[in-house]
Amino acid sequence: MSRWSVSQGCGNSHKALRMSGNREQLLSGWGAPGMLRPSMRSEAERQRSFRAWPRSCPQLSPVELARSGFYYLGPGDRVQCFSCGGVLRSWEPGDRPDTEHRKFFPSCPFLQQQQRGPGATDSVDGQVLGQLSGEEPDRTWEPVYPEMSEEQVRLGSFSTWPLDVPGSPEVLAGAGFFYTGHRDHVKCFHCDGGLQNWEQGDDPWTEHAKWFPMCDFLLQVKGEAFIRSVQESLFSSPEPSPESLGSYDYDRSLASSTESVSVPRAPTPGERSEPPKVSGPPLSTEEQLQRLKEERMCKVCMDKDVSMLFVPCGHLVVCTECAPNLRHCPICRAAIRGSVRAFMS
């Protein structure tokens, strides 16, 4: 299994991740929405999400991050906007959430609503975002798979677990996972987080806290201190070798179908990334709809809508049926460590 550690730390250049069919890139506008939590429309709930925020990060205020529309996503210092789905990481000392949000995602509906003033209607979903901050927050998420809530039921799902795969079914089931029946792919019954490519010595609880720190089941069983310690350890991890990250040669035949935004040159160490410049005449409504349809199309079967978000690369390029058959992301070729179902709005 190809391992991945958060090597960006808190002193490298920002990277914005787009939850769509494009490879990891900086954006200048709002794209197809990714995996968004409805409860994070509440500013108070966004503040609560920062319970596991690594203390080794720069002194960024969770209050300021939440006010700017961000909630904690993890691993490391990754945050996501509840409205546009934009993800930012690698925060530097002196960064201001509002400034970075506007720099990388200037077309965010939440930002646009702030400029229009309270009570303005959001043009994307027709809701009044100004009223959402007063919405009663969802204190606890219901399990995605309630039928797997019992540990013994989860353990029973491992009856066909491959004998040559590392990992104890008892420990995996105790950590909230059940077996999907595909190779070594397991899922959390509560947060729907999926993990695969297990290695000898991997601890299910630690991996759960590393990749899905906002899982309510994880929080209830292990507590904030455990999750925070796991997230803190990511910043002290050594730089990953090229071999551990896997090949990042892009499949141009696949990438060509997701060319809605040009891919900027990768920044050199210490260089500050700037958002790409958009050129050319604006697209018509019909062209925008066609492009959005192409973005949402599974890049493997070219039939169903994309619905599975790969971890750690963050690409959303395949449907639920095609995802279990892949071991590497078809866009960046990075080893797939886990996956999460993405709900498209």
Curated annotation (Swiss-Prot):
Key words, A-Z: Apoptosis, Cytoplasm, Developmental protein, Metal-binding, Phosphoprotein, Protease inhibitor, Repeat, Thiol protease inhibitor, Transferase, Ubl conjugation, Ubl conjugation pathway, Zinc, Zinc-finger
Modified sites of kind Phosphoserine: 237, 241, 253, 257
Organism this protein belongs to: Xenopus laevis (African clawed frog)
Organism classification: Eukaryota, Metazoa, Chordata, Craniata, Vertebrata
CDD domains found in the cross-reference section: BIR, RING-HC_BIRC2_3_7
Listed PANTHER family: BACULOVIRAL IAP REPEAT-CONTAINING PROTEIN 7, INHIBITOR OF APOPTOSIS
Region Disordered, annotated ranges: 258-286
Binding positions (Zn(2+)): 188, 191, 208, 215
GO terms for MF: cysteine-type endopeptidase inhibitor activity; cysteine-type endopeptidase inhibitor activity involved in apoptotic process; ubiquitin protein ligase activity; zinc ion binding
Catalysed reactions, as listed in the record: S-ubiquitinyl-[E2 ubiquitin-conjugating enzyme]-L-cysteine + [acceptor protein]-L-lysine = [E2 ubiquitin-conjugating enzyme]-L-cysteine + N(6)-ubiquitinyl-[acceptor protein]-L-lysine
Record gene name: birc7-b
The EC number(s) this enzyme carries: 2.3.2.27
Family under the similarity heading: Belongs to the IAP family.
Name of the protein in question: Baculoviral IAP repeat-containing protein 7-B
